[in-house]
A protein has these predicted regions:
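Cleavable N-terminal signal peptides
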Residues: 3-4, 14
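Cystatin/cathelin-like cysteine-protease inhibitor module
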Residues: 18-196
Length: 196
């Protein structure tokens, strides 16, 4: 018995030291660690997904919509009537105008197309990044189709033409070529105020 007490007395300091050094991780800390990892993974996945589906296109569209003209409390796209893209790249400009007109005629068969233009001089180019790494390039052009909507007014439609490129590869057209981004119905009295 004395021997057992002696062993117990010698073991107590060792047990006390072990319990101080090896504190188990609390449930709160475990949950915080899991949460941080999950948040980081979701953020990375969100960035990758955003690049794939073109979230920056939505940001770009908001920037494009900043150029809207307000008339009588309503916001309209400018009505462009001068084609600047044709001066630089005639073949691409003609293709865009032709495709935009065809898509417009299919969507609005009763409207009478007056003209179609690509008002920018060249492609608008952006760099696609994943974090701090360049993963590709993207370029955009917009074609506008203006049509008479019976005696009531006009229609002004904006079509997006987008191409993406991986480094060292050729540009590839987006699956929606062209993509109808926006159509404004414009009353007769407002139309002259929108001409650019």
């Amino acid at each position: 018995m004395v021997l057992m007490l002696a062993f117990l007395a010698m073991g107590l300091p060792t047990m006390a030291q072990k319990s101080n050094k090896a504190k188990p991780e609390t449930l709160v800390k475990k949950v915080q660690g899991i949460w941080k990892k999950a948040k980081k993974q979701v953020s990375e996945t969100g960035k990758e997904l955003g690049e794939k589906i073109g979230v920056d296109d939505l940001k770009k569209q908001r920037t494009e919509d900043d150029g809207l003209i307000e008339v009588e409390g309503m916001r309209y796209m400018p009505v462009y009537h001068y084609d600047q893209f044709m001066n630089k790249d005639t073949a691409a400009g003609q293709e865009m105008v032709k495709l935009a007109r065809a898509a417009f005629a299919k969507k609005y068969p009763r409207a009478q197309i007056l003209y179609s233009v690509v008002p920018q001089e060249d492609w608008t180019s952006t760099i696609v990044c994943n974090g701090e790494t360049v993963t590709g390039y993207r370029r955009r052009a917009y074609a506008y189709v203006v049509a008479k909507d019976g005696n009531d007014g006009y229609l002004n439609a904006r079509f997006l033409f987008r191409e993406d490129k991986q480094p060292g590869q050729d540009y590839v057209k987006s699956s929606a070529w062209p993509l109808l981004e926006r159509t404004d119905a414009i009353p007769n009295q407002v139309y002259p105020k929108l001409i650019q």
